[in-house]
Structure formats: structure tokens, C-alpha cells
């Protein structure tokens, strides 16, 4: 287990000795993945699975202390996969203590934070690392050690983050699907920061609702959650490299009757030393690593038909456009792409819904 997670666990354990209201919820799930074509990267040593069976569990325990003025949340997660050893893993999604006053709120421990409004990609959502072995869509996140302080004012909410410790991205193993052609050397990840995964990151966000409009501005400084992949000199594997970045973000959503108009964008910068190093490496390997300052944006709409055909469910149609200023489309996912999708919300107690979509490169 990550050493930052152990420290956060120890800090919270003492609070549980006091009398508290307790609530237990969560889920246990079975998953069946069937791949109708052989793995693209099968070889004499490894064969990608055509079928994957999985068991998942994510219980959530909530303790309410001091007449509800303090809350402790513990949410572990575990997955067992029949084919991919890297996908068999566990994580502490949340282990946090929260308290609040009239116009402020503090959270300390391991937690998850979501920023953004778009469906097809999440540009501004940078606090938590992606749990990529779960799914390639970036929806699943690892727990992040943090101290979060929010101030609530009439003109908006300002939230500051101190993020002590970094979580490396998870990747499928050689037998898994949605993997790269070259194997991933996750045991020897490289960092720009001398502190490596002990580097302390910082973030700041302001968000506010003005009539029918939700707006947010964010700033992040620290270790990028998106690794750069460089080939190892001897093994022929890919080595993740985590650079230091500054990122500015904006997200907007307008709720106008049955329409949801969505937009989010970022501007990300790297240190000149890192850009120069990867430019030189790119010259030697004839590759474009995409390490340059860039702008990316996603915008579009969702229109909802409420109760069509006299049913209790709602049907939404979505369309979004994705832009990235980097010229190399193989590096920039969503450089000049369009996303079309549909959502069915069943409006039941479990908030069940089905979301499906497809992205198309316009180049």
C-alpha cells in the first residue's frame, strides 16, 4: 500500500473510538468482458484474453460525529480479474475526515474530487489519478491524499488543495486489453521532481452559480497525472515519465429548459528543460512526444426528452467537439474529433442510467 495512504489511515483511526452514528452502504458486482477479435498484440510469450471475468466490491462506511458536525468516510475498493494480474488490485478510494462551519469546510485524508462538465473527455479534472485498468474512458479514479479547505461566499466558493503525495496511473498487463503495443514498465516510473511520488502539489478553484449558469476556474501546480511514455534503452518497454506542470482550467454549463450547454478548456505548460529533453529524444527516436505548452477544449450540448412515449424514463442526446492545439493527433487524444452519444435515465431509486457514444476523428 502507498505510504501516503498508511499515514492518512493512522491520522483518522483515533476519531473512531468516540460514539458515532454509523451507516453502511456500497455494492458488489460481477463483470463479463467478451472480446470478439483476437488481441492485437498477441505473441509467443503473451496472449491477450478473449474473455475476462471480474468481481468487484466497494463498501462505504460513514460515521457521523459531534451531532453531525464531523464526518468520517471510508470507502475501500477491490477488483479480482480472471485474466489480467495488473487489473486485480485494491485501492482506498476514500478515507477522510470532514468538518464545517457557517461559511467554511475542511476535508483531510484520502478523497476524490471531480471537476468538469463534458461527457466525452475530462480536461479540467486533474486532482485524482486515473485508474486506467478499470476502463479506458478515464471515469474511474484512485484516492488522493489531500487537505481541502473551502470558503463559501455570496460571490462564489473558493477551495484550496494541498496534495501530499502522488499516485501513479495503473495500466493493464501483457494479458490484458486496452494496452499499448510495448509492455509498460510500471515499476521504474521516472519523475521530473526530485521528491518523485512524495512531491507536494497545490490547486485552487473558484466556482459559482449565476442564474442558469454554472462556472468554474481552476489552477493546478505539481506532478502531471498524464504520464509521458518514453522507450527504455535496454528492455524495449515503455517507461512512464511524470513531469511538473502548471494548468489553468475553465468549465461552464448553461441549463436552459431541456438543453444543457457544456464547455471546458485548459492551458497547460511544461518547464523548458523538460521540453528540450524530449525534443532531443524525439530527434533520436523520430517520435513526437507532445511535450509542449498547449490548449485543449471540449464543448457541446445535451438535449433531454422527458418521459417519452408516456414512460418514466428520460432520453438524452449528446454532441461534443474536441480540440487540441498540438498538431500530432497520435499524442493529442481529441485533437479534432466529434463525439455523439445518447443517455437513458430510468429515474429509479438507484439512479440507473445507460450512456453510449462514439468518437470520430475528423482528420
How should these model regions be labeled?
Residues 42-47, 79-83, 131-135, 188-192, ...:
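Extracellular loop and loop/strand-boundary signature of outer-membrane beta-barrel proteins
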Residues 22-28, 70-74, 106, 158-160, ...:
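Transmembrane beta-strands of outer-membrane beta-barrel proteins
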Residues 47-57, 88-93, 141-145, 152, ...:
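Residues that define the transmembrane beta-barrel architecture of outer-membrane proteins
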Residues 30-36, 63-67, 76-82, 101, ...:
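Transmembrane beta-strands of outer-membrane beta-barrel pores
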Residues 30, 57-63, 94-99, 147-151, ...:
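Residues on the lipid-exposed face of transmembrane beta-strands in outer-membrane beta-barrel proteins
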Residues 222, 258-275, 279-361:
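Detector for outer-membrane/organellar transmembrane beta-barrel domains
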Residues 36-45, 83-91, 120-125, 171-177, ...:
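Outer-membrane beta-barrel translocator domains and adjoining extracellular loop/strand segments
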Residues 62-178, 211:
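Outer membrane beta-barrel
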Amino acid at each position: 500500500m502507498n505510504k501516503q495512504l498508511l499515514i492518512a489511515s493512522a491520522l483518522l483511526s483515533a476519531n473512531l473510538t468516540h460514539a458515532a452514528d454509523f451507516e453502511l452502504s456500497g455494492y458488489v458486482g460481477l463483470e463479463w468482458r467478451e472480446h470478439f477479435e483476437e488481441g492485437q498484440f498477441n505473441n509467443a510469450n503473451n496472449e491477450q484474453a478473449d474473455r475476462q471475468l471480474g468481481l468487484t466490491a466497494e463498501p462505504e462506511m460513514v460515521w457521523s460525529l459531534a451531532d453531525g458536525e464531523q464526518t468520517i468516510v471510508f470507502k475501500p475498493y477491490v477488483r479480482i480479474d480472471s485474466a489480467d494480474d495488473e487489473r486485480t488490485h485494491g485501492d482506498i478510494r476514500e478515507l477522510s475526515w470532514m468538518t464545517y462551519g457557517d461559511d467554511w469546510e475542511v476535508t483531510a485524508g484520502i478523497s476524490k474530487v471531480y471537476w468538469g462538465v463534458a461527457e466525452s473527455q475530462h480536461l479540467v479534472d486533474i486532482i485524482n489519478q486515473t485508474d486506467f485498468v478499470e476502463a479506458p474512458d478515464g471515469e474511474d479514479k484512485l484516492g488522493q491524499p489531500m487537505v481541502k479547505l473551502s470558503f463559501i461566499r455570496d460571490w462564489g466558493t473558493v477551495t484550496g488543495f494541498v496534495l501530499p503525495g502522488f499516485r501513479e496511473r495503473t495500466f493493464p498487463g501483457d494479458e490484458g486489453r486496452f494496452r499499448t503495443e510495448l509492455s509498460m514498465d510500471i515499476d521504474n516510473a521516472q519523475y521530473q521532481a526530485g521528491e518523485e511520488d512524495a512531491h507536494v502539489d497545490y490547486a485552487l478553484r473558484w466556482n459559482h452559480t449565476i442564474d442558469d449558469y454554472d462556472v468554474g476556474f481552476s489552477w493546478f501546480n505539481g506532478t502531471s497525472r498524464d504520464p509521458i511514455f518514453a522507450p527504455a534503452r535496454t528492455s524495449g518497454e515503455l517507461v512512464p515519465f511524470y513531469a511538473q506542470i502548471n494548468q489553468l482550467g475553465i468549465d461552464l454549463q448553461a441549463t436552459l429548459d431541456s438543453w444543457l450547454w457544456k464547455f471546458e478548456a485548459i492551458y497547460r505548460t511544461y518547464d523548458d528543460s523538460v521540453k528540450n529533453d524530449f525534443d532531443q529524444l524525439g530527434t533520436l527516436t523520430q517520435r513526437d512526444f507532445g511535450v509542449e505548452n498547449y490548449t485543449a477544449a471540449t464543448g457541446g450540448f445535451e438535449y433531454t426528452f422527458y418521459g417519452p412515449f408516456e414512460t418514466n424514463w428520460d432520453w438524452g442526446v449528446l454532441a461534443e467537439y474536441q480540440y487540441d492545439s498540438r498538431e500530432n493527433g497520435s499524442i493529442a487524444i481529441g485533437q479534432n474529433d466529434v463525439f455523439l452519444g445518447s443517455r437513458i435515465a430510468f429515474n429509479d431509486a438507484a439512479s440507473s442510467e445507460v450512456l453510449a457514444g462514439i468518437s470520430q476523428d475528423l482528420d
